[in-house]
Regions:
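N-terminal "arm"/small-domain region of PLP-dependent enzymes with the aminotransferase-like
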Residues: 1-30, 35, 343
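PLP-dependent aminotransferase class I/II
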Residues: 8-9, 20, 36-43, 47-53, ...
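Phosphate-binding glycine-rich loop
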Residues: 30-77, 91-95, 101, 167
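Structural detector of well-ordered beta-strand residues that form the stable sheet scaffold
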Residues: 54, 79, 100, 152-153, ...
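Short, well-ordered alpha-helices that flank and scaffold nucleotide-derived cofactor binding pockets
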Residues: 64, 68, 90, 117, ...
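PLP-dependent aminotransferase-like
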Residues: 68-156, 163
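Conserved active-site segment immediately N-terminal to the catalytic lysine
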Residues: 154-189, 216-221
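Short beta-strand-to-turn element immediately C-terminal to the catalytic PLP-Schiff-base lysine
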Residues: 178-179, 193-198, 238
Length: 365
């Protein structure tokens, strides 16, 4: 039996519903911004619970522009967690600011207890990550930010559809970034991103800056960039937006089954699930003893698994210039040696889940 990690070939089997909408778009010749983009931005804003949403061509640019909209520049410091994807730290570096890492916690989120110790006079922004579709306690983070008069940018790239009590990730910070990469809960056929804010002035700046700084066809208000989302992608996004909650509920059901079965095994540590927090399970991660050998065993048995990630950000080559070294963040470093990501997507059936659990149990016998 095969248990695939990637599910995109299943998602796009029903091509007719996409082709019908693409045909309308082609007939309209609206290939740059226009009504298709505006429609998706409004629908997404309503779904998340924000006043303004500004689409971009990917989540990385959404992060960069979010930081730039708050004036982050050379000489500033931005605090973030050291166990995220490269784009989180890369966006800070792209603005010329210094990356200040803090450790993760046992749920793989930013360790809130470490944030205040990392704050200096140069700290401009706290950048928490909603890692793997789970969330840190954003209310606590916002209290710290308010205390020190620091801005917050949420990396909610994996947080679409999640909930912190009744609120969505990406609605707490000043400006927040989302991703619609193919392996996200809400995705497009390629890359896509979104920036969300309730600030009218910031939203106006972002709309101009992401489109060369144009006021209209003949006038510029600033030098900007071109990071526009393509209208072709909104066709996929609008269809997926109608289905995203159903997709997430199926992933939650699969994750709950894995939790129930794997928590019995003393060789496996499942992260705490917080009451009244809805996780999207963009990734299903746990700590496994003998992780590397288990990974080989599962792959041999046709179960595709991944590691997110074997080298934390502070130990990556670009971090050497900042002066980080092994031992600086022990929790994240331990997790990098033990974490394994199992398939949990909405197209898995119960037999595949049971097979995966059995093979994990067989390995530890």
């Amino acid at each position: 039996m095969k248990v695939p990690f990637n599910y995109l070939n299943y998602q796009f089997q029903n091509k007719k519903k996409y082709f019908a909408e693409w045909s309308k778009l082609i007939d309209s010749s609206e290939f740059t911004l226009g009504p298709y983009i505006e429609k998706f931005e409004k629908l997404f804003a309503k779904y998340i619970g924000l006043k303004h949403c500004i689409s971009t061509n990917n989540g990385t640019d959404a992060l960069i522009l979010s930081l730039k909209s708050l004036g982050v520049k050379k000489g500033d410091e931005v605090i973030t967690v050291c166990n995220s994807f490269y784009a989180t730290a890369g966006a800070i570096d792209a603005c010329g600011a210094k990356i200040v890492f803090v450790d993760s916690d046992e749920r793989y989120q930013i360790n809130i207890d470490k944030i205040e110790k990392a704050i200096t006079k140069k700290t401009k922004v706290i950048l928490p990550v909603h890692w793997a579709g789970a969330s840190p306690n954003m209310n606590k983070i916002m209290k710290i930010a308010k205390k020190y008069k620091i801005k917050v940018v949420e990396d909610a790239c994996m947080g679409i559809g999640a909930k912190i009590l009744k609120n969505s990730p990406g609605t707490f910070g000043n400006v927040n970034a989302f991703s619609m990469h193919p392996l996200k809960s809400l995705n497009v056929m390629g890359d896509g991103g979104m920036i969300g804010t309730n600030d009218d002035k910031i939203a106006n700046w972002l709309r101009k800056y992401r489109n060369h700084g144009m006021v209209n066809r003949d006038e510029l208000s600033m030098w900007g960039v071109n990071v526009r989302m393509q209208p072709l992608q909104t066709v996929v996004a609008n269809i997926q937006l109608q289905e995203v909650d159903r997709i997430i509920e199926k992933r939650i059901k699969n994750a709950n089954f894995l939790d129930k079965e794997l928590i019995k095994n003393k060789n496996i540590k499942i992260p705490e699930r917080i009451k009244n927090y809805r996780e999207t399970f963009a990734l299903y991660m746990a700590n496994f003893k003998q992780r590397d050998n288990l990974k080989k065993y599962l792959i041999k048995n046709k179960i595709e698994v991944k590691i997110h990630y074997p080298i934390p950000l502070h130990l990556q080559k670009p971090s050497k210039k900042v002066g980080y070294k092994k031992g600086d963040f022990p929790i994240a470093e331990k997790q990098a040696k033990e974490l394994l990501t199992l398939p949990v997507h909405q197209y898995l059936n119960i037999d595949q889940l049971k097979y995966m659990v059995k093979k994990i149990e067989d390995f530890y016998k």
